[in-house]
Amino acid sequence: MLERLKDSLIRSPIIKRGEYNYFIHPISDGVPSIDPHLVEEISDYISEIADMNVDTILTVEAMGIPVANALSLKTGIPLTIVRKRPYFLEGEVELSQSTGYSKGVLYINGLKKGDRIIIVDDVISTGGTLLALVRALQTIGVEVMDVISVIGRGDGYLKLRELGVEPKILVTIDVGEKGVEIKDVFGNQ
């Protein structure tokens, strides 16, 4: 179950940014090259465990796009990308997001009250981006049927529970100076 993903995470190089051990991985960074078989493994697994009775697959640019696009191609469900710049379209929703290492503004277009969506993201660590996104979607009246993160690090996912959302994290990791340790795999009971 998710063997390519687990193996690739364990082999991830680690760099130090201040006191933070940062892992470099194709799914979270696009470096090194993104293996299409890895993306296929991930999208296949998501299609099995997620509520796919939705109108749209939603992801935040940039690194959620490869997996969300593969899932869209596999299921035939349209893909909507939350962008980091405005397009000034009617109905565009602006939201501020803050993570442990950055702050920014995101823009949602093309969604309306009553839409049913699944959110697919590459990594959840602090939970800041997904928390702001889910709040904005709930304000619009969009039904968040599922939240999927390929990789989880830390306990930022707990913040989503405050909004009634229980994210599914495919692989939960811990990152130390010596490397990535797999802590849990979704569905591995």
Swiss-Prot record:
GO cellular component terms attached to this protein's record: cytoplasm
List the protein's name: Hypoxanthine/guanine phosphoribosyltransferase
The scientific name of the source species is: Methanosarcina mazei (strain ATCC BAA-159 / DSM 3647 / Goe1 / Go1 / JCM 11833 / OCM 88)
Keyword annotations: Cytoplasm, Glycosyltransferase, Purine salvage, Transferase
Q: What does this protein do?
A: Catalyzes a salvage reaction resulting in the formation of IMP that is energically less costly than de novo synthesis.
One example GO MF annotation: guanine phosphoribosyltransferase activity
Catalysis: reaction(s): IMP + diphosphate = hypoxanthine + 5-phospho-alpha-D-ribose 1-diphosphate; GMP + diphosphate = guanine + 5-phospho-alpha-D-ribose 1-diphosphate
Q: Which family does it belong to?
A: Belongs to the purine/pyrimidine phosphoribosyltransferase family. Archaeal HPRT subfamily.
